[in-house]
Amino acid sequence: MKKLLVTGSTFPRWANDTEPRFILDYAKAMTKYYDVTVLVPGAVGAKEEEELEGVHVIRYHYFPIHKFETLCYPGAIVPRIKQKKIRILLVPFLLLSLHHQLKKHSKEFDVVHAHWLIPQGIMQMSVKNTPYIVTGHGGDVTSLNKGILKSMKLKCLERAKAITVVSDALQDYVKQLYPNQKTSIIPM
């Protein structure tokens, strides 16, 4: 059976968690076709590695003092930074750790599905020889569209084997910003 690595930054930390579970639900559905592993940031109180509802989950640490790994949970990265501005200092650590984990794990998989253009998509594009799919969920598509980040997002889309978005509006946005890109809509 082919192997699929799913990456994201929003994922249940444990059974019955209130964090959105759409990536877990997607990963569970894909187990019919692939041997699936999910790679997500660590969270205080969450297991580093486990089987969650039949899906293998790896949670990577991104800061030396684990109790300060508060960038992604609860909630999402941007709202967490807005809550406490100092959390922006965790972003480089998250990016470096994600890149390290992708280099470490991607070669074990036939394909990677990166949820969010930033940070998962742009980090995945730097890992050579592993085909990837990228999904845009919202702000990762509609914001940060100037300068180097726009260039990185464009390269991410160009190198992706497939591009998906979760709505018609996001598909239109991708087509405006990045002409000649084929996108599919897969609501989550």
PLM features: residue spans?
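N-terminal subdomain of nucleotide-sugar transferases
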Residues: 1-61, 107, 158-162
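Donor nucleotide-sugar binding/catalytic pocket of nucleotide-sugar-dependent glycosyltransferases
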Residues: 37-40, 56-59, 133-137, 150, ...
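A conserved catalytic-core segment of Leloir-type glycosyltransferases
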Residues: 41-93, 100
